Amino acid sequence: MTLTIPDELGKLHFVGVGGSGMSGIARLFLESGHTVTGSDVRHSANVDALRALGANIAIGHDAANVGDADTLVVTGALWLDNPEYRLALERGLPVLHRSQALAWLINRKRLVAVAGAHGKTTSTGMIVTGLLGLGADPSFVNGGVIASLGTSSRAGSGELFVVEADESDGSFLLYDTAVALITNVDPDHLDHYGSLEAFEDAFVAFAEESAELVVVSSDDPGAQQVTRRLRKAAPGKRVLTFGEAEDADIRVYSIVTDGPVAFALSHDSDVYSACLRVPGRHNAINAAGAFALLTGLGFEPAASLAAIAEFGGTERRFELHGTVAGVSVYDDYAHHPTEVAAALSAARTVVGDGRIIAVHQPHLYSRTRLFAKEFAETLEAYADETVVLDVYGAREDPEPGVTGALVADLFAHPERVAFIADWQAAADHTAEIAREGDFVITLGCGDVYRIVPQLLDSLRRVRE
């Protein structure tokens, strides 16, 4: 990878351009007037969207796809034997990680960066929705498609650039951040950082480098520790806290989750209330973080909260895909025990008298090994039935003994869980145990969403 980002990038070629993050960045370059080409192993809606904007996208990887590109952009999931990557090295082309390419764009604007182990995509979507509702025209890049906008990124005319900042490999430290939002510092990505202390250190550095304002959770223990360290290291830094804690600058209370989420916020002795369009107690907290950031930027509080409340969700975040014979099928990106608990808690608020059936795809061998017990305890506590698929390894090589069975075998009540590696068999099993009124939800940030059509087909075959 190129260590120094060039001043000019010229024509860009994106390897693995079909993913949500890469396609969003490619779109920004296209809308900023750059020539973009790319490749991916499979055709997708993201590929079609980029082609519609003028990008030449090839399906499959081949050295010829690089063409006359001046810069190669790659993702962390790239294998080093990729022919396009090898050709770029032979030609001496700059090879940028996607975070470096994004930094080249965003460091030219006033940057709002959203970081944290969970809640980044939703919080970013709320901030963008709020800014648009307040009349601003920000540029943005999000980890998921904002449903009301039909895109995960856009080049706007305003001074602000809102970005979901990736902490997984430390790349969020590349950005010249003006305003930072830290949703939480729950332990994750320890395969990269090596220890919880190093993970926390990265967030402290991220906060210290934020020039204007840091907005941080008052409820999360890791975030509290970052706040304490930040105030000691940079006593003049402007910090706003949000959450349910009594000492939070923006305090959330009176949360009602029976139906649409309603809650109240206290801010500078004033009280504001809102009702969201997305379910789940955690989204009241996410909205409070977005509110703290917008009011910290100087926007009027009541108007800010009203604009945030118009947020209608993002793809792959508690997304309904269909209902068959009274059985609803949802998909969610949750891939950490805390996220799984939040998604299933939200499901409980809408399922009524029905049961929750979780179809869980563990993500990464390292995460599965580290958190198998926590995944099992969370799934068993919040779901009535669970189907565990095999591990989606992404960038990692398989580890001996680390499969989905590692999670399933830790259930205290084995009759409530089934480890099924074959997707069709898993879909059929789910359809057979489901009954009218049940809530089926797929969980994971790999490719588990691809099982949803099989689930719906199996339900039609078994239930109708």
Swiss-Prot record:
GO BP field: cell division; cell wall organization; peptidoglycan biosynthetic process; regulation of cell shape
Gene3D superfamilies assigned: Mur ligase, C-terminal domain, Mur-like, catalytic domain, NAD(P)-binding Rossmann-like Domain
Nucleotide-binding in keyword set: yes
Record keywords: ATP-binding, Cell cycle, Cell division, Cell shape, Cell wall biogenesis/degradation, Cytoplasm, Ligase, Nucleotide-binding, Peptidoglycan synthesis
Highest taxon listed in the record's lineage: Bacteria
Pathway as given in its UniProt record: Cell wall biogenesis; peptidoglycan biosynthesis
Catalytic activity: UDP-N-acetyl-alpha-D-muramate + L-alanine + ATP = UDP-N-acetyl-alpha-D-muramoyl-L-alanine + ADP + phosphate + H(+)
Pfam families: Mur_ligase (PF01225), Mur_ligase_C (PF02875), Mur_ligase_M (PF08245)
Gene Ontology MF terms: ATP binding; UDP-N-acetylmuramate-L-alanine ligase activity
NCBIfam families membership: murC
PANTHER family: UDP-N-ACETYLMURAMATE--L-ALANINE LIGASE (PTHR43445:SF3), UDP-N-ACETYLMURAMATE--L-ALANINE LIGASE-RELATED (PTHR43445)
Full protein name: UDP-N-acetylmuramate--L-alanine ligase
